[in-house]
Curated annotation (Swiss-Prot):
One of its GO terms (molecular function) is structural constituent of nuclear pore. InterPro entries: Nup186/Nup192/Nup205. The keyword RNA-binding does not apply. Part of the nuclear pore complex (NPC). Forms a complex with NUP35, NUP93, NUP155 and lamin B. Does not interact with TPR. Interacts with TMEM209 and MYC. The gene is NUP205. This is Nuclear pore complex protein Nup205. Expressed in the testis. The lineage of its organism: Eukaryota, Metazoa, Chordata, Craniata, Vertebrata. It is linked to Nephrotic syndrome 13: A form of nephrotic syndrome, a renal disease clinically characterized by severe proteinuria, resulting in complications such as hypoalbuminemia, hyperlipidemia and edema. Kidney biopsies show non-specific histologic changes such as focal segmental glomerulosclerosis and diffuse mesangial proliferation. Some affected individuals have an inherited steroid-resistant form and progress to end-stage renal failure.
Length: 2012
């Protein structure tokens, strides 16, 4: 080699061969379309390997040196850079391996490296031992590939139905191999390779490990030899070998010997069959088109030389090592010659064809038939290959049909021999030695050949020439070897042979003839013909019946003989007292007769086993009465062997239920097993005695086994409950007791002459137990003692046998102990991997033991429940606990471990592994047991390793590896595939249930997690890394990975959908569980790239298994959701991004690197045709997944019943429903079947019996309906599950993944596409309503995100605009682009307005589709609609105080902005739906589910707010819904009252109330709405509600706001405020809106205030000050300022008498006084003024609290000032008669600077009016506040315009006030968003405060001016002598008069007498000081800064001027 020596890490002697075998399998067996091309490539590449079959690379000096130095210099490894140093040990091993197999040194190194890599697959083996396995596995793969390729050739015997291209390719390839001498190589290898020699070599070099390793190596070597031999066999079947090759084969067979048991081994059998097929010309009889081609290929017919050579070779007199083998070949040759001679144009071959007789004679002389029987047919491998059977069948039938003279000769010879024997016997001589027994051997061969029929071929049918035409299906299948319809002539000859041989049958061949018939009767139709033959044989001799003459082979003869024996033996029967009778010789029957009887009994059994008609016909025959005679004979003294056969025949009869029922009674009557003890009888009788005395002594137990077999058959056919009634307690118990105590419990201690019989006994008795327990269903009556009368006394009847077995298995009984001990012995035996006698029976016995435990586990819960309810004094213990018990032999609790060890034998004994897995799955549900099991499983390192290997091996088992094509495999293979599959399912279910238990649990151990440390610290690795074993997790990933490297996707998803579904579920559970999530996801991400490689292939498509497919996708999507969430949290952006691209991209990706086009190519071209603009787009994967969920669901046809009542059937079905493992409610079909059948069985009378078949048919209809219904439920559940998972994935993508990974525009497009698709699917008429809730949920999330995305985009656009036109720019800029028609994306959002409208329409359609029901679904949809409508809402804009600069004209003429346009279109679309939509929403708002009502109200709120036409308001009023809502307030009252208790019930009512009030408030904002509400009496309703009077006492500690953060449930005070504030807001809004009806509104509100006056007073007293109480005050003062005014009383349309008028006036007066009192608290220098500065170190959420409090306090001041102004204006039309609310004292400003202590009391006594000083103080305070607010506002605006430039600390601080926790975890972009949000809030708060300050200033100035004007100009000072008295009386009366203007002619001046001149002078002087220059300048500055644009122009200036003027006037 010129290339440098490099090592192939996959081992060139193994990896490539494994690959060839895989490719061959894909092409030939799995029929994968793309595999043909790959196979062609690989065959061309590896042709030399096939030509130099099994040839190893030779040793080589250069390589030797290279390896020698590898520890220092290293070796290069293919596909890896650099070199790798090899350890010395490995180099040593490589040289040993090189010598051992005579292979090149590098090849040895490769094997060892591959061994090291594969080591995890072979736990417990070293790399050297694994290398040995790999070496032979490579050989096996190449041999198997060769065999498969040859099997796929075109040829004469079979076809695999492959494509012509593939068949031609393999035929051509194998032809080339044959030309290179394949036959010679194969025969040489078969001779050279010898297991024993190989083992000796390996043994010498310590190349053999454990028993399992030895077994595996020996199996591999045997398989190599066998596959090579079978390659030749397959070749010969398809196209015969040439002359040289045939001679080589003959030469090989000459030297062959037989095995120890006399049969040929598998290899030589295959080679013999190959040679026989070379001589096979049976295909000529076919009429296929290809026949002529084949004839030309057949050297037998075309080459004279071939015939001559072979003929002379076979005529050669030299003996072979096996003369019988030589004879077989000669016979085949003779028959071939005879066949050729019958063809036309063969005269040239006459010299050979005439020698056929002589050749056949030679064969017969060498006992050909005996050899075929003893060495060929008996071989265990013979029945494993269908074409062996067919070839021997052809051989025999050809002989019988083509050589009739020979057959006649054989018969004549037999007759002659029989005569000689007869004469010898008569003369008393020994029979002559020279006798030939050829005919006898031929018959026995025929009997043996057809005795088994594994492929259901029923080839023996050819021997029966039917008198009537047979209605057979085509039995021969698609094979070409045998004609579908034999020529009748052949059949005639064969059937003649069968009949004639029975005529005048000589006694010597009587038994062989019967055995032949027994073989020929094997099969349903054959049995029928044989029965007829025996019937006909007897009938022709009816006349001489008395002599028992007639044909000895007839029913007549046989049953007559039986009767005679019975008569004869019955007379001989000694009395019961004669104890010794059993030991007398049985005089009745000679050995010869016994053999004959046994042969006939076996024939009878065969016939009646197959043919039910024969069974019934024989049984019902009046003269023969076989059952009676057999039972009679069983009571006689005959040998046990004969008794056994009689019992077996009875068992065959017992297959029919009608016969079985009577058989039970007969058995009981004849006491075959003694069940009744007669007191006078000293000696026990029956089978028990036979077992104990005769069989035990002989150490053979045929009778016991036969008896068990009989019982086994009978319990299956019919089970009598009252067996033995009248003579003993009725029931099966005596039989069960005998089987349990005498047979089962003692089977181990008995002696056995034949070792295998021990296990046969165990198997057959355990089978009975299994059947009894399988058919037992615990019933309530089993647990009640049933009394029966027996001979005049009451006795307890026996329990059902199932009950008894359950009781024994749920206790530490000998039976359970023996069963467990048997399991232990079984697993020990299997661990030896050695054959032993009775192995098959031991395996069966173990299987029954495991099945018994399984059944017990399944039934124990019901059994124990019923036992608990009953009065029975029985104690049982759950089996899972018993299994935890101590094993008496090992003194350990290892029972479960023993059961689990069977999984280790899953490959060799799949049934045992299946039962074991089922038991483990059953007991794993209990978490306490889990912990113990983990301990038991991990206690011993070697056992732990084995158990893990067992589980992994069962999961790994690849049936596809065996290439069993299910449609062509045998029944057994299909069954095993199903069992292996079920085992894997059970193991996965075990993992799933275990994962739900707390750690430590079995699943964690099996999946490779830490058990001794915390689970989350596990570091999962690939197998072999850091000593990590191969675990179930690796096996599961392996199952799912297969196929992900190609374009088809995971193979398991298609081929074993249920398995794949559970695998995905396990992985999801691991990812979802907090302990296992971290390690699992890390491992899947780093080592496997699992999710990406799996998600590529979504959606899966598998219509046939839709349920599994949907669940697979569900678990995978859920796992993907977790992965996206986790990677997003951990900031693993690249991982997140990769998955997002995969799911969301609409650009095609090419995942295939090797030039195979991606799947999307076709899509691209298709879409290219359809949409020219999106030519390169493909459908997003997330949408494809949605497409794959079919929303429509077929519903089964309703039941049509004739007999049963439909309603009752529905009821029964409902009663049979239960929750399955997945939590779906399905009907238990088995239980339903039992109930219905019991119902039918209960019917009495003839009519019922006649109609039974019809009733059963109807039951079948019901069951089919229920199965359909279950499937429907499961399918809907799966669809819902898939849709939920899809929704979860979509939600995670939108919420959890970093926003910047999806561009804003793409984000909107994605949401739009998903929304449109999901709507289209659910709005389809076929869509299942059950899916609506999930879809609605998804729509809600999607709309929320769409709304967010669009609004974010709007904000971002706005941020880019210049600072001045901040928001105006954004609103106007949209109109600079061209109109929408030209540019589709212009408009509101990236997705364009039209898309938004479509979404809105679909949402509304969806709402209407839900109709009356589905309110919860609509709840989601209302939420979605609200989010959608939010898009058209203007975002919070910062009030920069700039916008107002525009003139009114500019504002009126501004173009419509995007928000208004969208809003207008939205409302137009909503209104186009008319009353239908209104009706649905209004109905939901009024009744139904609370959340539904809240959302419906919110939606109404939103729509009414934008509905300019007021259509909805009109509908609400006219349809009465508004009135209903208003009236419901009174109903809410009581519920709300209950919410004020300290521990409230649910707060739902509160939230519903808040929603309702919010909606009513929204309605009240519209003038028309306010009028409607007044008309509906909303305020009257509020006045009636008592809840407002239930104001809770506040906690004094909560002064100045709550120090403790509030809990989730608000305190009673907060709850009360949540109830009161909406009512106050509603009143305020109504007062504001109802301008036309203002007085009416004010009157009603006043009544509301008065009816709750206590509460109102309490609020006005304002005992504690908190944000909440200030809010209340702010609202209340606002209402009072508009409602409690003079003149309102006169408008009240109530008939008030004097007294009530006084009362009302009193209330109003009190309100006034308290309001004015507030001024001194909030406007004065009181410490409340300092309230806002109390808490300097404010934290996040307290910041906004502080803002709220500040705002509320300013609002209160503003409201009180407004009230003062209103009182003044309304009460005093002229200045001269002004109402003075303030005394002319300015002392307030002076004397109130110090803090006061009595803040709890009202500050101003009610008799004292506040002085004007408070106004001045407020004015100054407000002016100062204004400037601080103004600065703060300006700073915030500039910060907002430059957020990105702010220092990080400031940004953080801003964020914290919005989001107190977790600021550090969010991205910078998100921090900016939060900071902006906070700044906008601050700006708007400051803007409001500025507005309030400005208002307060203006009002203060106005009031000051009015008072000063009055005092300084119009007031007449009085003398002050009685000022105190005057002030007390006059002020009081004046205030009342003022308030109500009740007496208009009141002389105001009289009230002013109390103001002295001194007061006035002091006032003027103080005022001049207080209202100084600085204050005036401030006020004018304020106007300049603010009031110009905001309010009355130069109002402040005018007032200041006037006040200044007033103060200048000198008073004289």
């Amino acid at each position: 080699m010129a290339t440098p020596l490099a090592v192939n890490s996959a081992a060139s002697l193994w990896g490539p061969y494994k690959d060839i075998w895989h490719k061959v399998g894909n092409a030939l067996w799995r029929r994968q379309p793309e595999a043909v091309h790959l196979l062609d490539k690989i065959l061309k590449k590896h042709k030399p390997d096939f030509i130099s079959l099994f040839k190893n690379p030779p040793k080589n000096v250069q390589q030797h040196e290279k390896v020698q130095k590898a520890s220092t210099e290293g070796v290069a490894i293919q596909g890896q850079q650099g070199t790798r140093l090899l350890p010395e040990q490995l180099i040593k091993e490589a040289f040993i391996l090189s010598d051992l197999f005579d292979i090149g040194e590098l090849a040895a190194v490769e094997l060892l490296l591959a061994g090291e890599h594969q080591q995890p697959h072979f736990p417990g083996l070293t790399r050297g031992l694994v290398a040995v396995l790999l070496y032979w596995d490579g050989k096996r793969c190449i041999a198997n590939s060769l065999k498969a390729l040859i099997q796929s050739r075109r040829g004469k015997t079979w076809t695999l139905e492959l494509s012509p291209e593939l068949a031609s390719m393999t035929t051509r390839f194998t032809d080339e191999l044959m030309e290179q001498g394949l036959t010679y190589k194969v025969l040489t290898l078969v001779s050279q390779i010898d297991v024993n020699n190989e083992f000796e070599k390996l043994q010498r070099e310590r190349g053999l490990g454990s028993e399992k390793h030895r077994k595996e190596v020996s199996d591999l070597i045997k398989e190599c030899r066998q596959s090579l031999a079978e390659s030749l066999f397959a070749w010969a079947c398809q196209s015969p070998l040439g002359k040289e090759d045939t001679l080589l084969l003959i030469g090989h067979l000459e030297r062959v010997t037989v095995e120890a048991n006399g049969s040929l081994d598998a290899v030589n059998l295959a080679l013999l069959m190959a040679l026989l097929y070379c001589f096979d010309i049976s295909f000529i009889e076919q009429s296929t088109e290809e026949r002529d081609d084949m004839i030309h290929q057949l050297p037998l017919l075309t080459e004279k030389q071939y015939i001559a050579t072979i003929h002379s070779r076979l005529q050669d007199s030299q003996l072979w090592k096996l003369p019988g083998l030589q004879a077989t070949v000669r016979l085949a040759w003779a028959l071939a010659l005879r066949g050729i001679s019958q063809l036309p144009d063969v005269t040239a071959l006459a010299e050979f064809t005439e020698a056929d007789e002589a050749m056949a004679e030679l064969a017969i002389a060498d006992n050909v038939f005996l050899f075929l029987m003893e060495s060929v047919v008996v071989s265990e491998y013979f029945y494993q290959e269908e074409f062996y059977i067919r070839r021997v069948h052809n051989l025999i039938t050809d002989f019988l049909a083509l050589m009739p003279m020979k057959v006649k000769q054989l018969r004549n010879r037999a007759d002659e021999d029989a005569r000689m024997i007869h004469m010898s016997m008569q003369m008393g001589n020994e029979p002559p030695i020279s006798l030939r027994r050829d005919l006898e051997h031929l018959m026995l061969l025929i009997g043996e050949l057809y005795k088994k029929n594994p492929f259901h071929l029923e080839l023996a049918l050819e021997y029966w020439c039917p008198t009537e035409p047979l209605q057979t299906p085509t039995i021969m299948g698609s094979y070409l070897g045998v004609a579908h319809q034999r020529p009748p002539q052949r059949q005639v000859v064969l059937s003649k042979f069968v009949r004639q041989m029975g005529d005048l049958l000589p006694p010597t061949i009587y038994i062989p003839y019967l055995k032949m018939l027994q073989g020929l009767a094997n099969g349903p139709q054959c049995a029928h013909y044989c029965f007829s033959l025996l019937k006909v044989n007897g009938s022709s001799h009816v006349e001489n019946i008395q002599g028992a003459g007639g044909s000895p082979v007839s029913w007549e003869h046989f049953f007559h003989s039986l009767m005679l024996y019975h008569e004869h033996l019955r007379k001989d029967l000694p009395s019961a007292d004669s104890v010794q009778y059993r030991h007398l010789p049985s005089r009745g029957i000679t050995q010869k007769e016994q053999d004959g009887l046994i042969a006939f009994l076996q024939l009878t059994s065969t016939i009646i086993t197959w043919s039910e008609n024969a069974r019934l016909a024989l049984c019902e025959h009046p003269q023969w009465t076989p059952v009676v005679v057999i039972l009679g004979l069983l009571q006689c003294s005959i040998p046990p062997v004969l008794k056994a056969e009689l019992l077996k025949t009875l068992a065959a009869f017992g297959k029919s239920p009608e016969i079985a029922a009577s058989l039970w009674q007969s058995l009981e009557y004849t006491q075959i097993l003694q069940t009744v003890r007669i007191p006078s009888q000293r000696q026990a009788i029956g089978i028990e005695v036979e077992l104990n005395e005769i069989e035990s002594r002989c150490e053979e137990y045929p009778l016991t086994r036969a008896f068990c077999q009989l019982i086994s058959t009978l319990v299956e056919s019919s089970f009598p409950s009252n067996l033995g009634a009248g003579l003993r307690p009725p029931g099966f118990d005596p039989y069960l007791q005998f089987l349990r105590d005498s047979v089962f419990l003692r089977f181990r201690t008995r002696a056995y002459r034949r070792a295998a019989e021990k296990w046969e006994v165990a198997e057959v008795v355990l089978e009975v137990f299994y059947k009894l327990l399988r058919d037992y269903e615990p019933q309530l009556e089993d647990f009640v003692d049933q009394f029966v009368e027996l001979q005049g006394e009451e006795i307890i009847a026996y329990k059902p046998p199932g009950f008894s077995l359950m009781y024994h298995l749920l206790n530490e009984s000998p039976m359970l102990e023996l069963a467990l001990s048997l399991l232990e012995e079984g697993v020990k035996q299997l661990d030896t991997y050695a054959p032993f006698p009775g192995k098959k029976h031991l395996e069966k016995a173990v299987q029954h033991c495991l099945a018994l435990l399984n059944l017990t586990l399944q039934k124990e819960n019901l059994f124990m429940d019923l036992l608990r309810e009953s009065q029975l004094a029985l104690i049982v213990c759950p089996l899972e606990q018993l299994l935890q018990g101590i094993n008496p032999r090992t003194k350990k609790a290892d029972n479960v471990v023993n059961i689990a060890r069977y999984l280790y034998h899953g490959n060799t004994n799949p049934e045992l592994a299946f039962e074991s897995a089922k038991i483990l799955c059953c007991i794993s549900c209990n978490s306490n047991i889990q912990i113990k099991l983990v301990g038991d499983f991990t206690h011993d390192q070697s056992i732990s390793q084995k158990l893990m290997a067992g589980f992994v091996e069962c999961l790994d088992c690849e049936d596809a590896e065996e290439f069993v094509r299910l449609e062509e495999g045998s029944e057994l293979e299909k069954k095993l595939v199903a069992i292996r599959h079920e085992t894997r399912i059970h193991i996965l279910n075990l993992l799933i249930t275990s994962l739900e238990c707390n750690p430590p649990n079995l699943a964690l151990y099996l999946l490779g997690f830490e058990l001794k440390k915390p689970v989350s610290t596990t570091n999962l690795q690939d197998p072999g890394v850091l000593g990590c074993p191969r675990t179930c997790l690796h096996a599961i990933l392996n199952i799912l990975e297969k196929g992900t490297e190609g374009r088809t996707g995971p193979v398991a998803v298609r081929e074993s959908p249920q398995l794949a579904e559970l695998c995905y579920q396990v992985i999801y559970q691991l990812c979802a569980c907090s302990d296992t999530s971290g390690p699992t996801m890390r491992y899947l991400r780093t080592s496997q790239d699992f999710l990406f490689s799996q998600l590529q292939y979504l959606p899966f498509s598998n219509k046939e298994y839709e349920i599994s497919m949907l669940n697979q996708m569900s678990w995978l999507m859920k796992t993907a959701s977790i992965e996206l969430r986790v990677t997003s949290l951990n900031r693993q952006r690249s991982h997140t991004q990769r998955l997002l691209h995969l799911l969301l991209d609409d650009m095609p990706v090419k995942p295939y690197s090797d030039g195979e086009g991606g799947i999307e190519d076709e899509n691209r071209s298709v879409s290219g045709f359809l949409h020219f603009d999106t030519a390169t787009k493909v459908r997003r994967k997330i949408l494809n997944i949605l497409d794959s969920i079919d929303f429509s669901q077929e519903i089964p046809e309703p039941l049509q019943l004739d007999f049963f009542d439909r309603a009752q059937i529905e009821q029964v079905i409902a009663n049979c429903e239960h929750k399955n493992l997945r939590g779906q409610t399905v009907c238990n079909v088995k239980l339903l079947h039992r109930v219905l059948v019991a119902e039918v069985n209960a019917l009495q009378g003839m009519a019922a019996i006649g109609q039974r078949p019809l009733l059963m048919e109807e039951i079948s209809t019901v069951l089919q309906y229920v199965v359909g219904r279950n499937k429907l439920l499961q399918c809907l559940h799966a669809k819902r599950h898939a849709l939920e998972s899809w929704r979860q994935l979509v939600e995670i993508i939108l919420t959890a993944c970093p926003q910047d990974l999806i561009q804003a525009e793409d984000r909107q497009l994605i949401i739009r596409d998903i929304l449109q698709d999901v709507h289209d699917k659910i709005l389809d008429d076929e869509a299942a309503q059950e899916l609506m809730p999930v879809v609605a949920g998804a729509v809600f999330t999607l709309t929320a995100h769409l709304s967010q995305a669009v609004l974010t985009e709007q904000k971002e656009t706005s941020v880019l605009g210049p600072a001045e036109a901040h928001y105006a720019f954004m609103l106007d800029s949209c109109f600079t682009s061209p109109p929408p028609e030209e540019n589709p994306l212009v408009g509101f959002a990236s997705i364009g307005d039209s898309s938004l409208y479509i979404i809105l329409k679909k949402l509304l359609d969806f709402i209407l589709k839900t109709g009356g029901g589905f309110q919860r679904v609509r709840t989601h949809l209302y939420g979605s609609l609200l989010y959608y409508l939010q898009i058209a809402q203007r975002p919070d804009e910062p009030d920069t105080l700039e916008a107002a600069k525009k003139t009114m004209w500019e504002r009126l003429t501004a173009p419509e902005d995007v928000f208004s346009k969208l809003q207008r279109e939205n409302i137009a679309i909503i209104e186009s739906y008319g009353a239908a939509l209104m009706e649905v929403v209004c109905r939901d708002a009024c009744d139904g589910h609370e959340i539904g009502r809240m959302l419906a109200l919110a939606l109404l709120d939103r729509i009414v707010s934008v509905d300019k036409q007021q259509q909805w308001l009109l509908y609400l009023s006219n349809s009465g819904y508004l009135k209903v809502l208003v009236d419901s307030l009174v109903e809410d009252d009581r519920t709300l009252q209950s919410l004020l208790t300290p521990q409230p019930p649910l707060l739902k009512a509160l939230y519903t109330y808040e929603s309702k009030m919010a909606f009513l408030t929204r309605v009240a904002k519209i003038q028309q709405g306010a009028l409607e509400l007044l008309r509906s009496g909303v305020i009257v309703r509020l006045a009636q509600c008592q809840v407002y009077d239930m104001r809770p006492e506040t906690d004094p500690q909560s002064m100045f706001g709550m120090r403790d953060p509030p809990m989730f449930i608000p305190t009673p005070v907060d709850r009360y405020r949540q109830i009161l504030l909406p009512a106050l807001q509603l009143c305020q809004v109504i007062l504001t809106s109802s301008m036309a009806q203002h007085l009416q509104a004010a009157g009603q509100v006043l009544q509301f205030l008065i009816s709750h006056s206590d509460t109102i007073q309490a609020i006005l007293r304002c005992q504690d000050v908190s944000a909440g109480s200030l809010q209340e005050l702010a609202l209340l003062t606002g209402i009072i300022s508009k409602a409690a005014l003079p003149g309102i009383l006169s408008e009240l349309d109530v008939d008030v008498n004097e007294g009530s008028l006084m009362e009302l006036q009193g209330h109003i007066g009190r309100f006034q006084r308290q309001c004015l009192g507030l001024l001194s608290r909030f406007g004065g220098s009181d410490r409340l003024r300092q309230f806002k500065f109390q808490d300097d170190n404010v934290e996040g959420d307290k910041v906004s609290k502080k803002d709220e409090i500040e705002l509320a306090m300013q609002q209160i001041c503003a409201n009180v000032m407004e009230y003062c102004q209103s009182l003044m204006l309304q009460s005093s039309p002229t200045f001269q008669h002004a109402v003075c609310l303030f005394t002319p004292s300015l002392s307030e400003t002076v004397n109130r600077d110090g803090p006061r202590q009595d803040t709890q009391a009202p500050v101003v006594p009610y008799w004292r009016l506040p002085g004007l000083g408070i106004i001045i103080y407020l004015l100054k305070q407000s002016a100062n506040d204004f400037f601080s607010y103004y600065d703060s506002h300006r700073q915030s605006v500039s910060k907002l315009q430059n957020v990105e430039q702010l220092p990080p600390d400031e940004i953080k601080e801003l964020c914290q006030s919005v989001m107190p926790a977790g600021v550090d975890k969010i991205s910078t972009a998100q921090k900016y968003v939060l900071a902006r949000r906070r700044l906008v809030k601050v700006i708007n708060n400051r803007a409001k405060l500025l507005s309030l300050c400005s208002f307060i200033i203006e009002t203060c100035l106005f009031i000051l001016w009015r008072h000063l004007e009055y005092y300084l100009l119009h007031c007449m000072p009085t003398d002050s002598q009685d000022s105190l008295f005057a002030s007390r009386t006059l002020f009081k009366s004046r205030r009342l008069q003022d308030s109500f203007a009740s007496e208009t002619n009141l002389d105001f001046r009289s009230g002013l007498a109390i103001v002295s001149q001194h007061d006035l002078d002091q006032l003027q002087a103080d005022a001049i000081n207080a209202f100084g220059e600085s204050l005036q300048k401030k006020l004018l500055d304020i106007e300049g800064l603010y009031s110009k644009v905001r309010s009355r122009y130069s109002f402040i200036q005018a007032l200041v001027r006037r006040i200044r003027g007033l103060l200048r006037i000198s008073r004289n």
